[in-house]
């Protein structure tokens, strides 16, 4: 008899999150309001950030952060290609040019030396990615950025709960976290911008809501006139309180959620030892992994089958998988626009990486099921 389908990810939503949404629905104020303010305050306190702005998506957050930094035509922004396409999309939509850099073949994160080689007089920002829950090596990067006077935007979409040398990601500089449905903490769709730069945070807050500088709840609670003034044209990237209410509960549960992920990940590492599936390696510097993803590299020469056959084999056993990610520069638009870009480590991994199930409501029996299925496929 076939076992039930095991997805590669599933949000951990319980009665507390459902009750929090119900409370907002009954309150009479369901869009951006007090729950947003509470979420911003609690998130900033947790990571040690001076400023926090809740937003409707990490893509929207990246868009207006780049805009707030003045990124535009003629500018270059350095980013790994081995990441989700939204980063490069936002750079291009602002008229700037993404400059793709290669990554370490086994952590899938770049480093300061590789990034420095890509800097030109047109470089205006660097976007390091904390990949799969591991922390980027930040100290050399910030030293490099300070030396050249270049802004840093940490892509912390995978890094809720990640620490680097004892400090939470988001404790310095500027970072963007994602609360998408598969992330370690979720509210279906949402994000948090954090920064120690007050002027930048104020501009992001203004740009997120039409460039008004205030939202409807501000006008209600502070008695402002219904029609606030546009300071500069902005967007509609505010987060609804229904989503913020879920995120508040998830934030309180984050340590518990990440601890469960770590138990599962360590069980995977133990049970997969000796198999030719090449999990990502942990960085050698001090960091606390959030275990957002558990990624294997399925190389046909080592495994006896390619990634597509591997994923199909698991699917036939009702086990879901994912690909995180097809390298950005290999997508049709970017391949046509930047045909000269060659990133050997990125391209090797992009053709082989595969995410296997990892979410907090999994059990060790689920891990046993997945690893047993993998062993059978490779036998």
Curated annotation (Swiss-Prot):
Q: Which InterPro entries match?
A: ArnB_NH2Trfase (IPR022850), DegT/StrS_aminotransferase (IPR000653), PyrdxlP-dep_Trfase (IPR015424), PyrdxlP-dep_Trfase_major (IPR015421), PyrdxlP-dep_Trfase_small (IPR015422)
For activity, the cofactor(s) needed are:
pyridoxal 5'-phosphate
Q: Name one Pfam family in it.
A: DegT_DnrJ_EryC1
Q: Name one GO biological process term.
A: lipopolysaccharide biosynthetic process
Question: Does the UniProt entry include the keyword DNA damage?
Answer: no
Example GO CC term: the record gives: membrane
Q: Which family does it belong to?
A: Belongs to the DegT/DnrJ/EryC1 family. ArnB subfamily.
Quaternary structure annotation from Swiss-Prot or TrEMBL: Homodimer.
What is the name attached to this protein's record? UDP-4-amino-4-deoxy-L-arabinose--oxoglutarate aminotransferase
Species whose genome carries this gene:
Pseudomonas fluorescens (strain ATCC BAA-477 / NRRL B-23932 / Pf-5)
From the broadest rank down, the organism's phylogenetic lineage runs: Bacteria, Pseudomonadati, Pseudomonadota, Gammaproteobacteria, Pseudomonadales
């Amino acid at each position: 008899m076939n076992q039930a389908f095991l997805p590669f990810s599933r949000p951990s939503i319980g009665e507390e999150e459902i009750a929090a949404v119900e409370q907002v629905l009954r309150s009479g104020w369901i869009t951006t309001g007090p729950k947003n303010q509470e979420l911003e305050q609690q998130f900033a306190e947790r990571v040690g950030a001076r400023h926090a702005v809740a937003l409707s998506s990490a893509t929207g957050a990246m868009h207006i952060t780049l805009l707030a930094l003045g990124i535009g035509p003629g500018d270059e922004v350095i980013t790994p290609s081995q990441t989700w396409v939204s980063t490069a999309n936002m750079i291009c939509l602002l008229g700037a040019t993404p400059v793709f850099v290669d990554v370490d073949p086994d952590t899938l994160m770049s480093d300061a030396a590789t990034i420095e080689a890509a800097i030109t007089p047109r470089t205006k920002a660097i976007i390091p990615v904390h990949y799969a829950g591991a922390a980027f090596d930040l100290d050399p990067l910030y030293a490099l950025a300070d030396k050249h006077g270049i802004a840093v935007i940490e892509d912390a979409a995978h890094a809720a709960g990640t620490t680097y040398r004892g400090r939470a990601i988001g404790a310095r500089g500027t970072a963007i976290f994602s609360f998408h449905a598969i992330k370690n903490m979720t509210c279906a769709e949402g994000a948090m911008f954090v920064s120690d730069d007050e002027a930048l945070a104020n501009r992001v807050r203004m740009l997120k809501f039409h460039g008004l500088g205030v939202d409807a709840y501000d006008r209600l609670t502070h008695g402002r006139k219904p029609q606030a003034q546009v300071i500069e044209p902005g967007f509609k990237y505010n987060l609804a309180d229904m989503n913020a209410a879920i995120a508040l509960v998830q934030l309180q549960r984050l340590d518990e959620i990440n601890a469960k992920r770590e138990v599962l990940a360590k069980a995977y590492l133990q049970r997969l030892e000796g198999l030719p599936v090449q999990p990502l390696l942990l960085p050698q510097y001090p960091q606390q992994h959030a275990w957002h993803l558990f990624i294997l590299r399925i190389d046909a020469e080592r495994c006896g089958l390619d990634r597509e056959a591997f994923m199909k084999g698991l699917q036939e056993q009702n086990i879901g998988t994912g690909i995180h990610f097809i390298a950005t520069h290999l997508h049709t638009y970017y391949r046509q626009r930047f045909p000269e870009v060659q990133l050997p480590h990125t391209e090797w991994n992009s053709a082989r990486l595969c995410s296997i199930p990892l979410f907090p409501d999994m059990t060790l029996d689920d891990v046993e099921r997945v690893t047993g299925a993998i062993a059978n496929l490779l036998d």
